[in-house]
Amino acid sequence: MKNNMKKFSLLLFGLVLLLAACGGGTESKGDEKNNASESGSKGEKTYKIGISQYVDHPSLNAATDGFKKAIEESGLKVEFDPQTAAGDNSLNTTIANNFVSSGVDLIFANATPSAQAAAAATGDIPIIFTSVTDAVGAELVASMEAPGKNVTGTIDLHPDTISKTVAFLKELGVKKVGMVYNAGEQNSVAQVTEVKKIAAEHGLTIEEASAATSADVKQATESLVGKAEAFYIITDNTVVSALESVIDVANTNKLPLIVGELDSVARGGLAAYGFQYFDIGYEAGQMAVKILKGEAKPAETPAQYPQNLKLVINKKVADSLGIDVKDTWGAELLEQ
């Protein structure tokens, strides 16, 4: 009897061990499954990117397209939230604050006012800008080489653009240059200041007119007729968004219109030293990819100048003004 009880106890003990082992094995597989699920979720994270664009016009639109293209080519899963401020700084601020409240992973700010609004809204969320002329002057970065904060991006003014443009105006025989810009845009003020400095060195004078809104552009341009021998429109968002008004005045009065970027040449400007806005948007997108992947930090990512500066001349406009394009200019002709 004792022997039977002993055998039964041993059998029961063995059964308990077997069940414990099976239970442990089941728990281990469950853990592995959960871990795999978590790992899969991390690998398939969808990033949220808020896009704040100051105003709707071809150059800024091209930059946004370039940014999206770089993101799409990276293979990252991304949800874009595109917003346009329509040139309204108060709306710019609202857009930036909404992005912060919704917890986006990154903000893409297209143009100086949008970048400034985003930088004021957050010191934590990475901000990548483009179409900014003077990032240091706008207090977006400490320096081009070492931004120092949560903000970096691409510039829309090559260091040689203004000097080459002024030299080209002189080559055309122009002595008095009319400039229309929004005095409330920091990037425009910085450019006009530089143009005045370089123009004086070449013996040219600058006649100015300010336009606070796109509706003011035509009247401001007309006020310079009789004072200027040519117009030079820089990368001012307010004026470029209403460029057709400037083109109309220039054409009516047979005055050369030099513009600040290539998209405006296609719209009817005579010429520009410039680059493709799509390209600087694309380069900004490449920065964003590295930051989202944890491969870089905005504070340590140098802001970049545009590459491939070239002179493009609208052949149709040149012909209408009786301007002979010289081979020595090394210009690329836009045939329309």
Language-model segment annotations:
Residues M1-S28:
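Sec-dependent N-terminal signal peptides of Gram-positive bacterial secreted proteins and lipoproteins
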Residues C22-G43:
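Bacterial lipoprotein signal-peptidase II cleavage site
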Residues K45-S59, V174-N182, F231-Y232:
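Short beta-strand segments enriched in small/hydrophobic residues
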Residues I49, F67, T152-H202, P302-V317:
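An alpha-beta-alpha
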Residues E79-S101, S210-L224:
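Structural motif
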Residues A135-K176, Q276-A296:
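Hydrophobic alpha-helical segments within soluble ligand-binding/sensing domains
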Residues K293-Q336:
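Hinge/cleft segment of the Venus flytrap/periplasmic-binding protein
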